[in-house]
Amino acid sequence: MQLGMIGLGRMGANIVRRLAKGGHDCVVYDHDPDAVKAMAGEDRTTGVASLRELSQRLSAPRVVWVMVPAGNITTAVIEELANTLEAGDIVIDGGNTYYRDDLRHEKHVVQEGNSPTRLCTSGGVWGRERGYCLMIGGDGDAFARAEPIFATVAPGVAAAPRTPGRDGEVAPSEQGYLHCGPCGSGHFVKMVHNGIEYGMMASLAEGLNILRNADVGTRVQHGDAETAPLPNPECYQYDFDIPEVAEVWRRGSVIGSWLLDLTAIALRESPDLAEFSGRVSDSGEGRWTAIAAIDEGVPAPVLTTALQSRFASRDLDDFANKALSAMRKQFGGHAEKPAN
């Protein structure tokens, strides 16, 4: 098939390379001319200088994949595409767009007669080799037309053992892509995926931190009125090799996972993770997942606590902590203990 790709960052460029390797022809555009120039020399890839030229180079009915940062940039690109594409063309939004924005974008595309297909990907910088997990929402006919593209980009059935009981024809989900439903559904599923990711990351990080501090009993304890003493220091005399623990967990343990694999790589490269400040960002999906849980009235304490922990990592709780110290001083005359 022929595809237009808008956005040649790490994800967009590697998706193009995976598609080209699978026999698809790609017309590519990026706001950075150097990025287009770098890609244009690669196999089955043609670079263009504008969205209008991209539209002209593609044969109707067109398939255009938008892979730019979510938010205002995606909105601007989709609005411009609505003026350059034709009835029956397919627009794939592959970024981490808020599913509610999908519903808003749909109006722009539908008004021009195009088929809005919202796609979300998981795979990051490893996707070129591993393939990308694709959660797709939108018109069913548009999905069917673009399915050869999805099948090429996805990891394939060999990426994981088949679930017991699935012995018949291989389903798209087993290949790593799924039509989740109407417009917005794909990004909704990816939103929850990322919320789960926050929780999994937080639990793994907290567990490793408990292991790292299991030698607290060997440290000099200074008892005072402001510090609860460690009652049983003899129980905390362990100096664990954290990279080795992560390595053994990778083999046969219940928590073995790709996330643990990546953590083991990071710990091998830097056992103390000294180059990281511990200031953890969030890209929005965790917040949106928490909002959805509130709107639905369903409990999600693990996911929301993981999100709040990211906020705390940026010292956004600094004033709250000062307020706590101030209250303790006011009601009990408790002085703050200096940091070690």
Task: Give the predicted meaning of each segment.
Residues 67-70, 96, 121, 154:
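Short glycine-/small-residue-rich Rossmann-like dinucleotide-binding loops
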Residues 26-28, 118, 297:
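Short beta-strand "acidic-cap" motif of Rossmann-like dinucleotide-binding folds
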Residues 135, 145, 157-334:
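Helical "substrate-binding/catalytic lid" subdomain
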Residues 64-80, 98-101:
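Beta-loop-alpha module in the N-terminal Rossmann-like domain of NAD(P)-dependent dehydrogenases
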Residues 47-49, 93, 111, 115-119, ...:
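General beta-strand structural signal in soluble alpha/beta enzymes
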Residues 1-63, 84, 88, 125-129, ...:
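NAD(P)+-binding Rossmann beta1-loop-alpha1 motif at the extreme N-terminus of oxidoreductases
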Residues 87-90, 94-143:
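Rossmann-fold NAD(P)-binding glycine/threonine-rich loop
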